[in-house]
Amino acid sequence: MSLSQPLFIKLLLKHWKIHNIPVSAGYLTYSTTLAIVPLVMVVFSIFTAFPIFQEATEQLKTLIYDNFAPNAGDMVEEYIDLFVANSKKMGIVSTIGLVVVALMLIQSIDETLNKMWRNHRKRSIFISFLLYAVILFIAPLLAGGSIAISSYIFSMAIFNENGLLSFSQQLLQYTPFLLIWLLFTTVYWLVPNTKVNILHAMLGAIVAAIFFTLGKQAFVWYISTFPSYQAIYGALAVLPIMLLWIHLSWQVVLFGGLITSTLNVYNEMKKGKLNL
C-alpha cells in the first residue's frame, strides 16, 4: 500500500482537528475514571470463576497496572484492590449498577470511534448490548487465556534446554506489545458500525501500539527524572499521574483509530469517490 504522504498527512491533520482528539480523549478519561473500578471488578470476577486462570490473573494484573499507571502501578493496584474488595460486599442491585457503569464506558468508546467514520447509523439496542457484553466478558477471557497458554508453552521442558530458556524469556517480553496490538486491531475492526478493512485496522493498531509502548517509556522516564509532582501533591500524587497517563493513552488509541478511518477516506479519494 503506497501512500502519497503529503495528501495522507494533510487528511490526517484535517481529521485530527475536525474530531478534536484531545477533547475526545478528555471525555473518555472522565468516563474511564468513573468506570475503572467497576470494570476491574467485572474483569477479575470473571477470572475467579475460572480456576484455570488463577496463575494468569496475577500476570494480567501486572500487565494492566504497569500499562494503566506506569511508575505508580503498585499504589493504584493497592487502591483498586481495596475498592474491588469492598464491592464484593454489595448486593445484587449495586453489582448490576457497577456492570452498567462499565458498559457505559464501552458505549462511550463506541460512539467516539464511530464519529471518526462519520457513521450516523445506530445499532439496535440488542446488538449494542450484545457487542458491549462480548467486549466486557469475552475480551478478559481471551487475554487471560493467551497469557496462560503462552506461560504454559514457555514453561515446557523444550524451552529449558539447549539455550532456549533465554529465547522463551525474550519472546515473553513481547507478549504485552502483541496483546496491545491485537486489542487495538480488534477495536478498530469491530467497533465501528461499518465495514473496516482489516489491513487498515492492523496498520492503525501497530502505529498506536508503538506510540503507546514508547509513550509509556517516555512517561516513566519523565516521572522518574522530574518528580516535582510528588512535592506538590504528596500522597495524592498518584491521582494526577493516573489521569495524565489515561488521557495520553486515549489520545494514542484515538490516533490509531483516526489513521484507520483516514486510510479508508484516502483510498476512496484515490478511486475518485471523494473530494478533499
UniProtKB/Swiss-Prot annotation:
The keyword Manganese belongs to this UniProt entry's keyword annotation: no
NCBIfam families according to UniProt: PRK01637.1 (NF002457), yihY_not_rbn (TIGR00765)
The keyword Membrane belongs to this UniProt entry's keyword annotation: yes
PANTHER family named in the record: INNER MEMBRANE PROTEIN YHJD, UPF0761 MEMBRANE PROTEIN YIHY
Disulfide pattern: none
Superkingdom field: Bacteria
Name of a matching Pfam family: Virul_fac_BrkB
Chief place of localization: membrane
Keywords (A to Z) from UniProt: Cell inner membrane, Cell membrane, Membrane, Transmembrane, Transmembrane helix
Membrane topology: Multi-pass membrane protein
Protein name: UPF0761 membrane protein APL_1950
Cellular compartments annotated: Cell inner membrane
Similarity-based family: Belongs to the UPF0761 family.
GO cellular component, one term: plasma membrane
UniProt source species: Actinobacillus pleuropneumoniae serotype 5b (strain L20)
Transmembrane feature ranges: 33-53, 90-110, 125-145, 147-167, 171-191, 203-223, 239-259
